Swiss-Prot record:
Protein name: 1-deoxy-D-xylulose 5-phosphate reductoisomerase
Gene Ontology biological-process entries: isopentenyl diphosphate biosynthetic process, methylerythritol 4-phosphate pathway involved in terpenoid biosynthetic process
Pathway: Isoprenoid biosynthesis; isopentenyl diphosphate biosynthesis via DXP pathway; isopentenyl diphosphate from 1-deoxy-D-xylulose 5-phosphate: step 1/6
The protein's role, per its UniProt record: Catalyzes the NADPH-dependent rearrangement and reduction of 1-deoxy-D-xylulose-5-phosphate (DXP) to 2-C-methyl-D-erythritol 4-phosphate (MEP).
Binding-site residues for 1-deoxy-D-xylulose 5-phosphate, renumbered to this chain: K126, S152, E153, S179, H202, S215, N220, K221, E224
Cross-referenced Pfam families: DXP_redisom_C, DXP_reductoisom, DXPR_C
Binding site for Mn(2+): D151, E153, E224
EC id: 1.1.1.267
Catalysed conversion reaction: 2-C-methyl-D-erythritol 4-phosphate + NADP(+) = 1-deoxy-D-xylulose 5-phosphate + NADPH + H(+)
Native organism taxonomy: Bacteria, Pseudomonadati, Pseudomonadota, Betaproteobacteria, Burkholderiales
NCBIfam families referenced in this protein's UniProt entry, alphabetically: Dxr (TIGR00243), PRK05447.1-1 (NF003938), PRK12464.1 (NF009114)
Source organism superkingdom: Bacteria
Gene (UniProt): dxr
Residues reported to bind NADPH: T11, G12, S13, I14, R38, N39, N125, E127, G208
InterPro entries reported for this sequence: DXP_reductoisomerase, DXP_reductoisomerase_C, DXP_reductoisomerase_N, DXPR_C, DXPR_C_sf, NAD(P)-bd_dom_sf
Length: 398
């Protein structure tokens, strides 16, 4: 039976990879809705190729631009805009599968709507779980939704875990691998001078700018630890992080009998996306087979928390619980945006997040409104801290 997809965040890197897999299997997958924020021209190209019933953008001006181009090309795709439209296409009867690939807190509401509608959810928006893990997982369970992780690490763990939840007691711990990003071996004293372009040059993966910076600070790995806690139900002290520069082993599961299962593959997001799209079957993802003889060597090391303070902050937020993870995520989003706009330096990202966590009293949220209030408060505090921060040094040009 053909799956009907709503793809949230279709113009990003996950969206590109998803549509590449979809295009390879038109008999298996069709597109009900595509969404983008402001990249209207790319969305038009996607709509003309995949003919969704609905396209959603962030604002009225972008919607008018997209609609004009689609009508001129003879497309009948309906164009909507705004947060409610994202929610509507996520819970619509027109789709059975929602690929949640919007970056950041903006992806929470539509992902939660998909869970409450009992959809099959391919989750790439880790912020949904970082901000409101208990609320989100309760919605998945209460409404019979199916959650399939798309992040390469969590998809790897999913593949290495037993399908029968009654057998999960045999798991000792899970191990998330991390490349270490572009600054794994860089002299720590020089990190203050890192530029946005340098931070966005990931050694192994092709990703968007925000997640590339998160990888460079290793905040991304910290968020993934929190995500793994909620998806797989393990406490933080049974989730390890291991630096693996080659990005060939995507994660591991250690069992009580001494066995360790690992999932390997070339670093290409089409592999976990294809796995989640077709699960429990397997389909061609367009990815080359892994040649271990050519790679020859795999290396590992423990993370350096001094070099990567954002990772330590994320682990601390998970341990503290309450609204700490939501505040961590919100402050990080504001700080990364400021760094990409060259308003703060690279090391100020961690300093900003730390300052927000120290300034914001932790508390247990009573519901989604409390989580969103904490998110807004953390963003306000982060913006205030950044406004008072000294300007970063200007790069010399020759």
């Amino acid at each position: 039976m053909q799956k009907r997809l709503t793809l949230l965040g279709s113009t990003g890197s996950i969206g590109d990879s998803t549509l590449d897999v979809v295009a390879r299997h038109p008999e298996r997958f069709s597109v009900y809705a595509l969404t983008a924020h402001r990249n209207g021209d790319k969305l038009v190209e996607q709509c003309l190729r995949f003919a969704p019933e609905v396209a959603v953008v962030g604002d009225a001006n972008t919607a008018a631009h997209v609609e004009a181009k689609l009508r001129a090309a003879g497309s009948k795709t309906i164009v909507l805009y705004g947060p409610q439209a994202l929610v509507d296409v996520s819970k619509s009867d027109g789709c059975d599968t929602v690929v949640a690939a919007i970056v950041g807190a903006a992806g929470l509401a539509p992902s939660l709507a998909a869970a409450r509608a009992g959809k099959r959810i391919l989750l790439a928006n880790k912020e949904s779980l970082v901000m409101s893990g208990a609320i989100f997982m309760d919605a998945v369970r209460d409404h019979g939704a199916i959650l399939l992780p798309v992040d390469s690490e969590h998809n790897a763990i999913f593949q290495c875990m037993p399908r029968d939840e009654n057998e999960h007691g045999g798991i000792s711990k899970i191990i998330l691998t991390a490349s270490g990003g572009p600054f794994r071996t860089r002299e720590p004293a020089t990190l203050a001078d890192v530029t946005p372009d340098e931070a966005c040059k990931h050694p192994n993966w092709v990703m968007g700018r925000k997640i590339s910076v998160d990888s460079a600070t290793m905040m991304n790995k910290g968020l993934e630890v929190i995500e793994a806690h909620w998806i797989f139900g393990l406490p933080g002290d049974r989730i390890d992080v291991l630096i693996h520069p080659q990005s060939v082993i995507h994660s591991l599961v250690s069992y009580r009998d001494g066995s360790v299962l690992a999932q390997l593959g070339n670093p290409d997001m089409r592999t976990p996306i294809a796995h989640a799209l077709a699960f429990p079957e397997r389909v061609d993802a367009g990815v080359d087979q892994l040649d271990l003889a050519q790679i020859a060597q795999l290396s590992f090391e423990k993370p350096d928390y001094t070099r990567f303070p954002c990772l330590a902050l994320a682990l601390k937020a998970l341990e503290e619980g309450g609204i700490a993870s939501a505040a961590l995520n919100a402050a990080n989003e504001i700080a990364v945006e400021a760094f990409l706009e060259r308003r703060i330096g690279f090391m100020a990202i961690a300093a900003t997040v730390d300052a927000v966590l120290n300034a914001l009293p932790n508390r247990s949220p009573n519901g989604l409104d409390d989580v969103l209030a904490a998110d807004a408060e953390a963003r306000r505090l982060a913006a205030e801290i950044i406004a008072k921060a000294p300007a970063p040094r200007v790069e010399r040009t020759v």
